[in-house]
């Protein structure tokens, strides 16, 4: 599939030619990641960190912006990650994977008998965050591994380096540096040789400039990281996503599973052809192809129960798609919330409770208790309910009742302070990753 890249330099989103010459610059990173994440993973790269343009604390003009993006999508982050502490911090802040460049290699290698990798660092890194979270860059110039912001090469060939690097990574990112930003196509022969040499996931970058090349790389078994072609409009993520799907295997129809973003509950399953995907991306509402009516249909166009699309992800075989959605009403024609059960209502979740609280404050209804809660009163109720839960609840039923009361008042307090449950989940996830 396709991974969109957000490269940052001097606090701006940029695209460089050959890693040196500025071609374009923009300042809409938030809008970009919100758009890019609909189609797949997003690579966020700190070019200043890669080039060691840092202050005494190791920060760059991009640090604040980069950290703010990590929880806004399925993000892999790279650029200047040279120690385990930095990698752990980025993972704890929300990055799903880290991209290791120069630090992975033995840059002092002069003979074939010298080690290829910085094995001590890589072993410590895998122990700290897990091999599955590590990507190693096998960027190359004229077939030699490039380091230090692509300013130098080391005495390591692409293929021998890749064979060793896969021992410490879940995937390899290959950038053909001499093709980077040139919009002339990548080096397909080098990519093919790399793909045949290793067993892990391979992502190709540098020069990819057409849907035809993306499709060819997909058939080769490689994912593609897009930069210049995306920003200049030569390739759209919509077309790239669709071009990677295997319609031949499924007679032109791809099964699409709709999953509630908030509860992770499966809502429904339908089939989509290319035109249905195009309409889904255009409207941001999940659209299928009706095999009985032989036409496109957007879920909700009759009932008003639309499925607003957050993101789409293809499976490993590219013949099934998972759509993460925000449902507006139930999905099933029977009136049930989901097509996979008899429950007629949306499952109660903390997010749903929070949404109801927000609605009560925004549009108070006569007799609404929630709307009467001022800051002082809600804090008193949190303390009161916590005491009842810990001191008065004796039976299982008592604990359930008091815990529900406490969560309600905690949710009200959070709303008033501008904190939502996703913020809390992120903090819990951060603590888990730090262990």
Predicted feature residues:
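Flexible "arm" and connector segments at domain edges
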Residues: 159, 219, 225, 229-403, ...
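Hydrophobic faces of well-ordered beta-strands that scaffold small-molecule active sites
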Residues: 2-8, 42-44, 75-79, 98-100, ...
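Short catalytic helix/loop segments, enriched in acidic residues and glycine
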Residues: 18-37, 62
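Conserved anion-binding
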Residues: 8-21, 91-180
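C-terminal helical cap(s) of enzyme catalytic domains, especially alpha/beta-barrels
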Residues: 108-128, 214-243
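Short loop-to-alpha-helix "cap/lid" segments that border enzyme active sites
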Residues: 63-66, 151-171, 185-199, 208
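Glycine-rich, proline-tolerant flexible connector loops at the mouths of alpha/beta enzymes
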Residues: 41-61, 102-114, 174-184
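Catalytic cores of alpha/beta
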Residues: 65-98, 189-224
């Amino acid at each position: 599939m396709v991974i969109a890249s957000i490269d940052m330099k001097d606090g701006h989103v940029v695209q460089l030619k050959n890693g040196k010459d500025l071609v374009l610059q923009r300042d809409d990173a938030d809008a970009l990641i919100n758009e890019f994440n609909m189609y797949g993973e997003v690579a966020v790269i700190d070019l200043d960190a890669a080039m060691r343009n840092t202050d005494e604390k190791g920060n760059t003009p991009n640090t604040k912006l980069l950290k703010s993006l990590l929880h806004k999508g399925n993000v892999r982050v790279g650029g200047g990650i040279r120690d385990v502490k930095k990698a752990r911090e980025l993972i704890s802040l929300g990055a799903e994977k880290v991209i290791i460049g120069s630090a992975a290699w033995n840059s002092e290698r002069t003979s074939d008998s010298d080690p290829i990798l910085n094995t001590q660092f890589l072993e410590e890194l895998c122990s700290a965050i897990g091999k599955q979270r590590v990507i190693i860059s096998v960027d190359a110039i004229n077939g030699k591994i490039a380091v230090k912001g692509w300013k130098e090469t080391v005495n390591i060939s692409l293929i021998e380096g890749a064979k060793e690097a896969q021992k410490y990574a879940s995937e390899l990112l290959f950038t053909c540096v001499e093709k980077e930003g040139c919009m002339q196509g990548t080096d397909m022969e080098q990519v093919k040789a790399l793909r045949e040499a290793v067993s892990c996931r391979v992502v190709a970058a540098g020069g990819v400039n057409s849907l035809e090349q993306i499709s060819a790389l997909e058939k080769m078994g490689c994912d593609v990281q897009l930069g210049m072609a995306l920003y200049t409009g030569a390739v759209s993520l919509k077309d790239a996503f669709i071009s990677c799907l295997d319609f031949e295997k499924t007679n032109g129809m791809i099964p699409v599973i709709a999953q509630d973003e908030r509860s992770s509950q499966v809502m429904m399953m339908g089939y989509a052809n290319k035109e249905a995907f195009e309409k889904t991306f255009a409207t941001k509402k999940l659209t299928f192809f009706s095999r009985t009516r032989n036409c496109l249909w957007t879920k909700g166009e009759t009932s008003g129960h639309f499925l607003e699309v957050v993101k789409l992800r293809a499976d490993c075989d590219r013949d099934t798609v998972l759509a993460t959605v925000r449902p507006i009403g139930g999905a099933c024609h029977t009136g049930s919330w989901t097509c996979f059960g008899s429950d007629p209502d949306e499952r109660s979740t903390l997010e749903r409770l929070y949404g109801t609280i927000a609605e009560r404050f925004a549009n108070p209804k006569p007799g609404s208790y929630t709307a009467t809660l001022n800051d002082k009163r809600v804090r008193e109720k949190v303390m009161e309910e916590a005491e009842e839960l810990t001191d008065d609840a004796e039976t299982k039923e008592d604990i359930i009742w008091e815990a529900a009361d406490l969560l309600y008042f905690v949710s009200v307090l959070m709303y008033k302070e501008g904190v939502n449950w996703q913020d809390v989940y992120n903090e819990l996830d951060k603590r888990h990753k730090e262990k």
